[in-house]
């Protein structure tokens, strides 16, 4: 192999959505880029698959909704990503009535008055609306900064307070300085309504609402900051359509994408060694002026031969299903189509969330398991074949909370136990067992699959099964953080000048956003520009 074949301006390790965004931006800028992906296809956790034999459904196996992908990234790269807004925000059956009443919230986030009354939350109507209005004073100003060089904490706060005054200052304090549980409890009194708000702080995050570490606050902020509004969208065609568009854009701009490339070693000088996926398993060596890494920080340390620091574990379970029809509800005031079009909260009241954390922290599977479901195919039936659409089939995705495999000791049979817990939780508020409406595959097996945190670690290399590659970070720097290099200014620095994070482990990198990839690419371009200016 010649030096030309080995030497690149940038080598990208990992072909998830962030790696694809980074590769596309840098190739678009005229740099020579090679992207290395261990699996047979790019996309990472943002992929669609046909999970069940003979059942033509493009299921989003891992990631499934989009809020944090800036339209500017899509436009810059010319990636035809299509997103659709869900017709309802959420429905929450009341556990106190075994699901015979519940709360339906429309697409603009306004609960229906009759439903508030039905769950005993009518006095909380104003507090609920005011809480989210105050949150938007923070998120509307923070959102554009996620694809700009980092502000310090004080700079971010000052901008928000200058924009929104005393009310914005109070909102900053509630969201950033104090446990978010205080603000939620102060805004509304109803147990169910508090839980509806609180779930956004606990997605993939093992914490209590009053946790002094504020890790729940950071998760909450990321779930509300997308677009400045926190609206979550359905990717048309499934999540795989998003990464397919990004991969096509990267290749069109000139990036070289190599799949089946299992990187086993990195060197701080930019040398990358990998095995090819083939019968010979040949070893390859390439060099980059820069190496952008989309794997977790723990995996990066291992590739460098450095000590691996402990990362926060993931805390979720995901269950995908195909059903013959949506299950019937016990609440006659809503239809299944309304209830499952948005987020269907199950056993996620404030008190249930706290009890579930306590049970999991003591090594017990929460009972009932807090979880939330949604039906992709109601908003986007294109993921179903014409035959399945005509038959009335639908998809259901269920996301369970407080289930880190690390706290349950023996993981033998954990997936089966988690599946049973998810189904039992769902059935506690349905008018019929969910098992009775499952579609069956070509082998007459029910169409249901479960992905645990252990599965994510094994299949995708996500350390601890953490969907954010570790604990999320605030989308701004601490006031005393050094911001003296482009990598630090963009939140992608490692201990090595040539190596930068471009995945979810980068600051501001979590969720399907492309922000980690964008910011790493901007850091590389800034480095090159500064070198050209140097005498």
Swiss-Prot record:
Keywords: Cell membrane, Membrane, Transmembrane, Transmembrane helix. It is a multi-pass membrane protein. Disulfide bonds: none annotated. This is Uncharacterized protein Mb0921c. The keyword Transmembrane helix applies. It is found in: Cell membrane. The keyword Ribonucleoprotein does not apply. Gene3D superfamilies: FAD/NAD(P)-binding domain (3.50.50.60). Pfam families: NAD_binding_8. GO terms for cellular component: cytosol; plasma membrane. The chain crosses the membrane at residues 7-27, 509-529.
């Amino acid at each position: 192999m010649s030096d030309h074949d080995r030497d690149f301006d940038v080598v990208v390790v990992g072909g998830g959505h962030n790696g694809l965004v980074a590769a596309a931006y840098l190739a678009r800028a005229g740099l020579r880029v090679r992207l290395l992906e261990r699996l047979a296809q790019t996309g990472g956790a943002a992929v669609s698959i046909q999970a069940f034999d003979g059942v033509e459904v493009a299921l989003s196996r891992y990631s499934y909704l989009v809020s944090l992908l800036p339209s500017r990234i899509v436009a810059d790269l010319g990636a035809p990503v299509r997103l659709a807004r869900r017709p309802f925000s959420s429905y929450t059956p009341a556990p106190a009535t075994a699901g015979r009443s519940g709360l339906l919230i429309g697409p603009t986030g306004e609960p229906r008055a009759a439903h508030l009354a039905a769950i005993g939350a009518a006095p909380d109507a104003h507090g609920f609306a005011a809480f989210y209005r105050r949150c938007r004073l923070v998120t509307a100003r923070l959102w554009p900064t996620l694809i700009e060089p980092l502000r310090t904490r004080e700079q971010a706060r000052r901008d928000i307070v200058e924009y929104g005054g005393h009310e914005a200052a109070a909102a900053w304090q509630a969201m950033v300085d104090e446990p978010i549980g205080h603000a939620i409890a102060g805004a509304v009194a109803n147990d169910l309504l508090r839980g509806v708000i609180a779930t956004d702080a606990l997605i993939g995050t093992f914490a209590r609402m009053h946790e002094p570490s504020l890790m729940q606050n950071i998760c909450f902020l990321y779930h509300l900051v997308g677009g400045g509004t926190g609206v979550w969208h359905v990717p048309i065609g499934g999540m795989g359509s998003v990464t397919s568009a990004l991969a096509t854009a990267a290749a069109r701009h000139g990036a070289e994408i190599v799949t089946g490339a299992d990187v086993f070693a990195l060197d701080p000088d930019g040398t990358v060694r990998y095995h090819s996926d083939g019968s010979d398993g040949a070893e390859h060596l390439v060099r980059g002026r820069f190496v952008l890494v989309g794997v977790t920080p723990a995996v990066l340390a291992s590739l460098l031969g450095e000590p691996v620091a402990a990362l926060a574990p993931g805390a979720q379970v995901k269950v995908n299903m195909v059903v013959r029809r949506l299950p019937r509800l016990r609440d006659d005031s809503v239809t299944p189509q309304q209830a499952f079009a948005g987020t269907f909260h199950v056993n996620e009241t404030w008190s249930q969330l706290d009890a579930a954390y306590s049970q999991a922290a003591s090594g017990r599977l929460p009972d009932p398991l807090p979880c939330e479901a949604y039906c992709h195919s109601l908003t986007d039936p294109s993921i179903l074949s014409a035959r399945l659409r005509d038959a009335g089939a639908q998809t259901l995705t269920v996301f369970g909370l407080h289930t880190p495999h690390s706290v349950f000791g023996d993981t033998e049979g954990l997936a089966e136990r988690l599946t049973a817990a998810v189904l039992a939780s769902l059935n506690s508020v349905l008018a019929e067992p969910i098992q009775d409406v499952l579609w069956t595959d070509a082998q007459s097996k029910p169409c249901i699959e479960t992905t645990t945190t252990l599965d994510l670690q094994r299949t995708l290399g996500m350390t601890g099964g953490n969907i954010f590659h570790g604990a999320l970070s605030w989308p701004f720097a601490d006031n005393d953080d050094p911001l003296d290099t482009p990598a630090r200014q963009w939140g992608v620095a490692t201990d090595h000048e040539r190596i930068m994070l471009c995945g979810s482990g980068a600051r501001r990198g979590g969720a399907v956003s492309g922000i980690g990839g964008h910011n790493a690419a901007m850091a590389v371009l800034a480095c090159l520009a500064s070198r050209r200016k140097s005498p």
